[in-house]
């Protein structure tokens, strides 16, 4: 049997009275592309033609002059020569046969003629219609379903004729060439021409030449055509013309794919929501590129809706690997557009890869202007899916009825949208004096094989005399059937009603139905005539006629409407304006019988293995094994790609690849592995191709594309942090490690990889490291100093410093060490002092004191003493003491002392005391003493002091001192002392003292004293001391001394209570207690302040 394919084709032959034939509007029904054209035809009265035929004189009547003026004004703007190339490719899903058709119409030598009719043809394929276009399969792979424009489209051509000067028109046409390559391409270049022509007086028919015959309008100049019935504007509502029913012609399905001349029907019904399965995964769809372009000239921003200009939406997107079979995504077209211009049902393109595998199928929701795609198990088999979608859509004339409407159109895939601003432009009526009309095909029903034509008669509201309308199905390249089954309805437009510029009526009930059988008569030549008579209102004619798609010579649907009005009732002069509306189908069959064989496709594979011996050749080691789950990606020539993973045997495979094309295969390196050597040995079936390779199909499968990997070795880094006691920067045998030191490992960019601390032996280690560059950082331990770095010649024994840059190349590195030693001095002293000193001191002392004293005392004393003493003291003491005193005393004493003492003592004391005292003393002492002291003091001191003091003192001192001291002090002090000493001592003493004191003392004293004294002393002392003192003291002194005494007594010690110096001794004891009380009082006050 012979399976016919409906393919795009334009029939080419010399045609009389035709010029500027071109495709205007296209849509796709199944594999049928439909383009609608409109041809305007203007006729002239016989008298004008005859005058021109018989004479060359330029004679015109006044009416004709007016006519030419109007006509030539239009012609200057609209007359053009047009060349159209229509390239259309159709895909048949059922058998995967791709048919390509290219059409080129060239129009030359257009001259003036008597009746110039320009036709537009539209070619229709009846294969599956899709939005998603594919480029011709000339070894170019796209993950793209280019949209086959699943809409009927329409445009118009118009020309106006006046009969004044003879002319002829020559049209040269090139036959279109039909091919049956594997192509899924569908696009059309359509436009409209509007011309005004003068009538020819002669014409002839030649090959590639069209001339207007002189007889065309001979019998239509002096009288109206026979069979017309005159009617006036007053037309009452009548029943449907011809009283014939018609099947519903709206919302019908159209063929999607076919292998015979009588196609089967697949359809998508609009207003039916997609049955969603799985989850909506719009959030997992990544749009990488999208754009909106105009069908003709994208730079002008104008959509010529009556010229079949469409909007093209291109989007490229990636599908996340998380998407599963049954999940859905959405694509939204603009709310002011429709996928099809003439049909109410259409197919939604499947999203396929370049090998033909279906990624997703779609359904359309007309209410929401949304396509819902459901993913197949393709997404479960492949990864890194990239797709390209190309959709075409047309202006929805129900949404945009008016000319020059500005729109901001928006298209959206998943969550990403794109916008474009356009202006919608509609054609204007064709007029020739009072003859004016506008016509378009507005619907095609491919199931019932009917077309609907909407005609505006007198839309410009002229006063048109003797108006006649002829509707003819006699197209030169195809015809409709005008017979008893044709439905014609006539509607009158009221004075306050407007006709939509879109030439599309959606609700005829708004207009007055004036259909009348009496004024419409069927002709004898597949036509019908309607006589309107004299009118000045617009009318709408709706014509529903049939076509026969099974006729052997059937190629187009063509229907012509002509309006004729009388200009001069006396001469019979008239004017005509015509439209030819055309939908062109072309059929083609495969070579011979049956379907065209599918194009042969090929495979690429095959193996990924673990190359244990790293030689780049398979099977050279018994331990080598396949690697599973390795990601392998195939990239098509257009940049789209898909990925699979190797199975448990290390195998992978890509199918459906085209011969002669070059593909890229990429292997992802598994974690923990390194690519082995590539192109080793002489056998390409056993070597490794590395990470990526380009493969060209040369008429056979290529199952030699393999890749090998070996496990990447891991390395360690360390090693040691030690206590460098000799500070030489080199590890010594007796030097120990330092534990707890923080060590940080970073990459070469400073990003932290890991941290650790040294163990009890000072060791640390980082493992599982690849070859590369690293940074090791040591945190310096508190109280220690970085030792010398890079000392000596042994890198494993020296210190490398705080931060070390390390390069690991196929080996461990245990030479990264560092050393530290203790700080020499760390002194932190905080002292705030304000002193004013004026002193005059001459001191020479040599003190030798040997005392060993251990005192442990805990005393809490609260005393209230009243002492009245008069003492006279004469003492000679020799003291040898060794004392070690650690005292914390708190004294609370309240003493009132009045003493007068006279003491004469000679004491020899050798004491060994161990004292630990804790005393709390609060004393209030009132002392009245009278002492007379004569002392001579020489002081020479050599002191070694280690003190920890924090002193905050405010002292006012008047001293003059001359001191000779040798002091070696190592102090680390942090001390904060606040001493508040308030001492009020009123001393009135009269003492006579003669003392000779020889003291040899070696004392270690740690004291904290707070002393406030106001004393008036006159002394001269001679003292020799050598003391080693560690003291923390706060002192606030106000002293005034001016005395010089030197006494020596040797009197015998008196009996207790019987000595004549008793008064003096009492005074001395009272003074001693008073001083002690003052000291303890100051200490207590200081302690209280510290506690506060």
Curated annotation (Swiss-Prot):
Residues 52-599 are annotated as: Ligand binding A region. GO terms for cellular component: extracellular region. The lineage of its organism: Bacteria, Bacillati, Bacillota, Bacilli, Bacillales. The keyword Metal-binding applies. Residues 64-76, 791-801, 820-1039 have a biased composition (Acidic residues). Residues 1-51 form the signal peptide. Residues 50-63, 99-119, 141-151, 195-220, 802-814 have a biased composition (Basic and acidic residues). Keywords: Calcium, Cell wall, Metal-binding, Peptidoglycan-anchor, Repeat, Secreted, Signal, Virulence. GO terms for biological process: cell adhesion. Residues 600-713, 714-824 form the CNA-B domain. Residues 50-236, 780-1068 are annotated as: Disordered. A motif (LPXTG sorting signal) lies at residues 1053-1057. The modification Pentaglycyl murein peptidoglycan amidated threonine is found at residue 1056. PROSITE patterns: GRAM_POS_ANCHORING (PS50847). It is a peptidoglycan-anchor. Disulfide bonds: none annotated. It holds the Pfam family SdrG_C_C. Belongs to the serine-aspartate repeat-containing protein (SDr) family. Residues 1057-1092 form a propeptide. Gene3D superfamilies: 2.60.40.1280, 2.60.40.1290, Immunoglobulins. The addition of calcium stimulates the interaction between fbe and fibrinogen, but this effect could be due to calcium binding to fibrinogen rather than to fbe. Ca(2+) binds at residues 294, 299, 302, 309. This is Fibrinogen-binding protein. Residues 120-140, 160-170 have a biased composition (Polar residues). Residues 579-590 are annotated as: Interaction with human fibrinogen. It comes from the Bacteria.
């Amino acid at each position: 049997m012979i399976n016919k394919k409906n393919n795009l084709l334009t029939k080419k032959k010399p045609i009389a009275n035709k010029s500027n034939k071109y495709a205007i509007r296209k849509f796709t029904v199944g594999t049928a592309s439909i383009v609608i054209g409109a041809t305007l035809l203007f006729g002239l009265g016989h008298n004008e033609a005859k005058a021109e035929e018989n004479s060359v004189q330029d004679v015109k009547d006044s009416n004709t002059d007016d006519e030419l003026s109007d006509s030539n004004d239009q012609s200057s703007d609209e007359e053009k020569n047009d060349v159209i190339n229509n390239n259309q490719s159709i895909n048949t899903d059922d058998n995967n046969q791709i048919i390509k058709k290219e059409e080129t119409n060239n129009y030359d030598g257009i001259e003036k003629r008597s009746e110039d009719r320009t036709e537009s043809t539209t070619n229709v394929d009846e294969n599956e219609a899709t939005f998603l276009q594919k480029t011709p399969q000339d070894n170019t792979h796209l993950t793209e379903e280019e949209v086959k424009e699943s809409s009927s489209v329409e445009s118009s051509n118009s020309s106006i004729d006046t009969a004044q000067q003879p002319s002829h028109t020559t049209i040269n046409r090139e036959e279109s060439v039909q091919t049956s390559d594997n192509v899924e391409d569908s696009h059309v270049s359509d436009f409209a021409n509007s011309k005004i022509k003068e009538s020819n007086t002669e014409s002839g028919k030649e090959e590639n030449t069209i001339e207007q015959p002189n007889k065309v309008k001979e019998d239509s100049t002096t009288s109206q055509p026979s069979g017309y019935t005159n009617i006036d504007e007053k037309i009452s509502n009548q029943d449907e013309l011809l009283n014939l029913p018609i099947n519903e012609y709206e919302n019908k399905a159209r063929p999607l794919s076919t292998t015979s001349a009588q196609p089967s029907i697949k359809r998508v019904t609009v207003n039916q929501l997609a049955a969603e399965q799985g989850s909506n995964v719009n959030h997992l769809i990544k749009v990488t590129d999208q754009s909106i372009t105009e069908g003709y000239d994208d730079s002008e921003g104008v959509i010529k809706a009556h010229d079949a200009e469409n909007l093209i939406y291109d989007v490229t997107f990636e599908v996340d690997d998380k998407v599963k079979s049954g999940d859905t995504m959405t694509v939204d077209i603009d709310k002011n557009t429709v996928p099809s211009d003439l049909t109410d049902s259409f197919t939604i393109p499947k999203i396929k890869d370049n090998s033909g595998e279906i990624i997703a199928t779609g359904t359309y929701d007309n209410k929401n202007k949304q396509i819902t795609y459901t993913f197949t198990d393709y997404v479960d088999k492949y990864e890194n899916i990239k797709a390209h979608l190309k959709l075409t859509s047309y202006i929805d004339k129900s949404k945009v009825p008016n000319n020059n409407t500005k729109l901001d159109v928006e298209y959206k895939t998943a969550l990403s949208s794109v916008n474009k601003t356009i202006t919608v432009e509609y054609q204007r009526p064709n007029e020739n004096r009072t003859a004016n009309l506008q016509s378009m095909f507005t619907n095609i029903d491919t199931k019932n094989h009917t077309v609907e034509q909407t005609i505006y008669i007198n839309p410009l509201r002229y006063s048109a005399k003797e108006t006649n309308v002829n509707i003819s199905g006699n197209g030169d390249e195809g015809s409709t059937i005008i017979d008893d089954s044709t439905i014609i309805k006539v509607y009158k437009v009221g004075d306050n009603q407007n006709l939509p510029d879109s030439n599309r009526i959606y609700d005829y009930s708004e207009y007055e139905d004036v259909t009348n059988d009496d004024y419409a008569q069927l002709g004898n030549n597949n036509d019908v005539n309607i006589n309107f008579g004299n009118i000045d209102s617009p009318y709408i004619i709706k014509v529903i006629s049939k076509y026969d798609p099974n006729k052997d010579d059937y190629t187009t649907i063509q229907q012509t409407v002509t309006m004729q009005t009388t200009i001069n009732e006396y001469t019979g002069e008239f004017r005509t304006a015509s439209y030819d509306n055309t939908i062109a189908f072309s059929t083609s069959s495969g070579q011979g019988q049956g379907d065209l064989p599918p194009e042969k496709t090929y495979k690429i594979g095959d193996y990924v293995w673990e190359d244990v011996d790293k030689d780049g050749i398979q099977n050279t080691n018994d331990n080598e094994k396949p690697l599973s789950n390795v990601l392998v990606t195939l990239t098509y020539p257009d940049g789209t790609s898909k990925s699979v993973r190797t199975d448990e045997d290390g195998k992978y495979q890509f199918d459906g690849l085209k011969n002669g094309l070059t593909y890229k295969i990429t292997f992802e390196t598994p974690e923990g592995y390194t690519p082995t050597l590539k192109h080793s040995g002489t056998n390409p079936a056993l070597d490794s191709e590395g990470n990526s390779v380009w493969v060209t199909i040369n008429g056979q499968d290529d199952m030699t594309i393999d890749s090998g990997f070996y496990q990447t070795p891991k390395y360690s880094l360390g090693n040691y942090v030690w206590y460098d006691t000799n500070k030489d920067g080199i590890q010594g045998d007796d030097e120990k490690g330092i534990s707890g030191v923080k060590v940080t490992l970073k990459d070469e960019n400073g990003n932290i990889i890991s941290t650790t601390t040294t163990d009890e032996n000072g060791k640390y280690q980082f493992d599982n490291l690849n070859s590369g560059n690293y940074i090791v950082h040591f945190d310096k331990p508190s109280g220690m100093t970085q030792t010398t770095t890079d000392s000596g010649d042994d890198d494993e024994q020296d210190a490398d410093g705080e931060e070390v840059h390390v390069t690991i190349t196929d080996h461990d590195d245990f030479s990264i060490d560092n050393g530290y030693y203790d700080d020499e001095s760390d002194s932190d002293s905080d002292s705030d002092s304000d002193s004013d000193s004026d002193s005059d001191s001459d001191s020479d002392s040599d003190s030798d004191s040997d005392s060993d004293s251990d005192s442990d005392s805990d005393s809490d004393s609260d005393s209230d003493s009243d002492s009245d003493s008069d003492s006279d003291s004469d003492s000679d003491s020799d003291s040898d003491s060794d004392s070690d005193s650690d005292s914390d005393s708190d004294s609370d004493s309240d003493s009132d002392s009045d003493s007068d003492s006279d003491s004469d003592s000679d004491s020899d004391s050798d004491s060994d005391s161990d004292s630990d005292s804790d005393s709390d003393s609060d004393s209030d002492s009132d002392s009245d003493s009278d002492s007379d002291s004569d002392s001579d003091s020489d002081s020479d001191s050599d002191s070694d002091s280690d003190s920890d003091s924090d002193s905050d003192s405010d002292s006012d001192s008047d001293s003059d001192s001359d001191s000779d001291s040798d002091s070696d002090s190592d102090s680390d002090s942090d001390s904060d002392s606040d001493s508040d000493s308030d001492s009020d001592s009123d001393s009135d003493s009269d003492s006579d003292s003669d003392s000779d004191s020889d003291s040899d003392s070696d004392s270690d004293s740690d004291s904290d004293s707070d002393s406030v004294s106001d004393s008036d002393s006159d002394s001269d002392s001679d003292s020799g001391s050598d003391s080693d003192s560690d003291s923390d003291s706060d002192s606030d002194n106000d002293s005034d001394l001016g005395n010089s005494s030197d006494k020596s007594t040797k009197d015998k010690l008196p009996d207790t209570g019987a000595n004549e110096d008793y008064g003096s001794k009492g005074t001395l004891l009272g003074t001693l207690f008073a001083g002690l009380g003052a000291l303890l009082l100051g200490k207590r006050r200081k302690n209280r302040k510290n506690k506060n």
